[in-house]
């Protein structure tokens, strides 16, 4: 999986969204998705053709798994970025820089109306894992140069600030030696 922001489609979209308000972003993103064949119907033909199965979802995304490719499709509702598509794409770029082995890849948009669409990403499915313990997360983040901050699940290395790094978003191999941060909010300090 490549860095979503370095892929030509995501980068061209980001260039179009710079300087637009979150409300102005939606019609531009939807037009871009239509012109670039990146409209993804997560409840219709797209999902049915791929035999996607509804999978564990969280507050900010609905998830499906593709059993043939071992990819998780994540439809993000933009809740954690205040409806700002560009802000989400920038966060994904930072996340992918920190966690390239479990990177998100931008696929397109699930369009609900002319003024509303949710970005869709894929991420490798990690099998034979369990939720990491708080202790495992702390040890892993410290090994990466991050220090815990005042709030639970928040870490910083002085350059990046990660939040929501909690057991619900971090997986560990059965022996605890491999850690996968499958969901985290990343920003620059």
Q: Language-model segments: which ranges?
A:
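Catalytic activation segment of kinase domains across protein kinase-like and atypical kinase folds
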Residues: 77-78, 154-189
């Amino acid at each position: 999986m490549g860095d979503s922001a370095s892929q030509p489609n995501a980068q061209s979209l980001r260039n179009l969204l710079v300087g637009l308000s979150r409300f102005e972003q939606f019609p531009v993103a939807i037009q871009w998705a239509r012109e670039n064949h990146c409209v993804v119907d997560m409840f219709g033909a797209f999902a049915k053709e791929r035999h996607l199965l509804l999978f564990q979802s969280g507050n900010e995304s609905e998830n499906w798994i593709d059993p043939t490719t071992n990819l998780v499709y994540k439809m993000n509702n933009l809740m954690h970025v205040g409806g700002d598509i560009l802000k989400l794409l920038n966060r994904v770029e930072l996340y992918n820089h920190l966690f390239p082995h479990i990177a998100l890849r931008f696929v397109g948009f699930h369009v609900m109306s002319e003024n509303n669409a949710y970005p869709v990403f894929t991420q490798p499915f990690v099998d034979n894992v369990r939720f990491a313990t708080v202790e495992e997360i702390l040890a892993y983040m410290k090994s990466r140069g991050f220090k815990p901050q005042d709030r639970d699940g928040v870490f910083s290395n002085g350059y990046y600030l990660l939040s929501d790094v909690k057991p619900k978003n971090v997986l560990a191999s059965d022996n605890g030696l491999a850690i996968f941060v499958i969901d985290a909010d990343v920003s620059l300090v």
